[in-house]
From Swiss-Prot:
Chief location category: nucleus
Protein name: Velvet complex subunit B
Lineage of the species this protein comes from: Eukaryota, Fungi, Dikarya, Ascomycota, Pezizomycotina
UniProt-listed GO biological process terms: sporulation resulting in formation of a cellular spore
Protein species of origin: Gibberella zeae (strain ATCC MYA-4620 / CBS 123657 / FGSC 9075 / NRRL 31084 / PH-1) (Wheat head blight fungus)
Domain annotation Velvet: ranges: 147-452
Stated role: Component of the velvet transcription factor complex that controls sexual/asexual developmental ratio in response to light, promoting sexual development in the darkness while stimulating asexual sporulation under illumination. The velvet complex acts as a global regulator for secondary metabolite gene expression. Component of the velB-VosA heterodimeric complex that plays a dual role in activating genes associated with spore maturation and repressing certain development-associated genes.
One Gene Ontology term, aspect cellular component: nucleus
Record's subcellular location: Nucleus; Cytoplasm
Keywords: Cytoplasm, Nucleus, Sporulation, Transcription, Transcription regulation
Biased segments, Low complexity type: 15-37, 232-241, 280-301
Length: 470
């Protein structure tokens, strides 16, 4: 036993090279050897590598190894070792599970690369390009006149930009600014050159204007206006082609309002609560408005008067007579039209001078040409629109000296569309456009174009500017 305790001397020998800074007591060093020998597999992973190397230095001496072997064998025979063995298995799996999480982050950088691979955002600009495609310019028409061989075409030199809606009244007129100016181009089909406009007779040249939607697909010349008290005007635009003559759209304007349409229902005076049967009026008599102040179901009257014929007689009040037995089909259709559609009349959305005569004018470069100036055009409702210009020669083909007006049909020799312009409400209107040099040039030649005077002094110029904006 004494020999077993002498190893501390050996430990004092060995720590010399291993522990240069501090020499622990021999008992403490021996305990470190026992701790290192009892759980070598379990304590290897938790402690740092430096402690493993420091504890690994003392084991070389043989006496501690024999004692450690005896101790380890003694621990295997003792009951505590099974408890140590139960603690040993959980540690190794933790050592193997730790590297796996380090391997899992590796696939994480792969998904970002996959996210970078699909380029749906790059495909998103393509729809925007498709939205830009509808902004095509509607096609223009250019034809050659029979008999003369002249080819006519239209060129909108001054495009409309904006306007303020004028509403459904006739007093407040807000012209489109700047006024559209269209130049008529005439080319000789034989020579391919423009004709001399100074020698051309333009007295029978006429340009008509229509209002179209912003894409130039359909016309929107009509708009329904509501005339009822306290009701605003509708901004639904319509075209002439959608309103067929066979439909009762125009006939309904002559029909009475909703009050009178409900009033004929009392022609039979089915108000038994107010009037006795002896006082009831006949079918042909028109009751006063006082008797029709309260509306009730007309069927209440007929069962109580067996003396009257249930079939309505042929009278002027027949079409408007309403009962549960004999009803006029035409009257029903008219009543259905009045009931389903709101009150109001169709009116033109584009108002003003919708046809213009030609003028021989000089442009800003003092070059003569045939021009159409449309300075009196207004739009009732707000929105984005286009103008379609159609040129017609109402004179005889050939343009002889004895000018005569064509009494039949005149073909459209040229047509074109303007760029889209915006019509604003009174609150959103940014103001009229500045007068252009072309407008000023035409105004000096006698064309009635509203020109805003350029002056910095308070006076007529400022008053005119305020008048245009208000």
């Amino acid at each position: 036993m004494n020999s077993s305790y002498h190893p501390p001397d050996m430990s004092q020998r060995m720590p010399g090279p291993g522990y240069s800074s501090s020499v622990p007591p021999p008992i403490h060093a021996y305990q470190q050897q026992q701790q290192h020998q009892h759980p070598p597999p379990s304590l290897l992973p938790p402690p740092p590598t430096q402690h493993h190397h420091s504890s690994h230095a003392p084991p070389p001496p043989p006496p501690p190894s024999s004692s450690s072997h005896s101790l380890s064998s003694h621990q295997h025979h003792a009951p505590p070792p099974p408890h140590h063995h139960s603690q040993l298995p959980p540690y190794p799996p933790t050592q193997y599970q730790q590297p796996h999480p380090n391997q899992y982050p590796r696939p994480h950088p792969l998904p970002p690369s996959r996210n970078d691979e699909p380029p749906p955002p790059s495909s998103e600009p393509s729809p925007s390009d498709q939205h830009e495609k509808p902004k095509y310019e509607p096609p223009s028409v250019s034809k050659i006149e029979e008999g003369t061989g002249l080819k006519y075409s239209l060129d909108v030199q001054q495009q409309p930009i904006r306007a303020r809606m004028c509403g459904f009244g006739d007093k407040d007129r807000r012209p489109i600014t700047p006024p559209p100016c269209v130049r008529l181009v005439i080319i000789n089909s034989e020579t391919g050159k423009e004709v001399d406009y100074n020698t051309l007779d333009h007295a029978m040249f006429v340009l008509s204007v229509d209002l179209w939607d912003k894409d130039g697909i359909k016309e929107v010349n009509l708009v329904r206006s509501s005339t009822g008290p306290g009701s605003g005007a509708s901004s639904n635009n319509y075209s002439y082609s959608t309103l067929e003559p066979s439909t009762p759209s125009y006939q309904q304007q002559a029909l009475p309002p909703s009050r009178e349409s409900g009033y004929p229902q009392g022609q039979g005076l089915g108000y038994a609560q107010e009037y006795p049967p002896s006082v009831q009026q006949g079918y042909g008599q028109a009751p006063s408005y006082q008797s029709s102040s309260s509306y009730g179901p007309p069927q209440q009257y007929f069962p109580r008067h067996s003396g009257y014929n249930t079939d309505p007689p042929a009278s002027s009040a027949n079409p408007l007579f309403r009962n549960g037995y004999g009803q006029d089909q035409n009257a029903l259709t008219r009543m259905a039209v009045v009931g389903t559609q709101p009150q109001g009349m169709f009116t033109r959305n584009l108002i003003g001078s919708l046809a213009a005569s030609a003028f021989r004018l000089n442009d800003t470069d003092k070059k003569a040409g045939i021009w159409f100036v449309l300075q009196d055009l207004s739009v009732r409702t707000e929105g984005t629109f286009r103008l379609r210009f159609s040129f017609v020669n109402v004179g005889g083909a050939g343009g002889g000296l004895p000018i005569h007006v064509n009494q039949g049909r005149a073909p459209i020799l040229a047509s074109c569309y303007s760029q889209d312009f915006s019509v604003y409400s009174a609150k959103k209107f940014p103001g009229v456009c500045e007068s252009t040099p072309l407008s000023k040039t035409f105004a000096l030649q006698g064309i009635k174009i509203p020109i805003r005077k350029d002056t910095n002094i308070k006076g007529e110029g400022d008053e005119e500017m305020m008048y245009d904006q208000n």
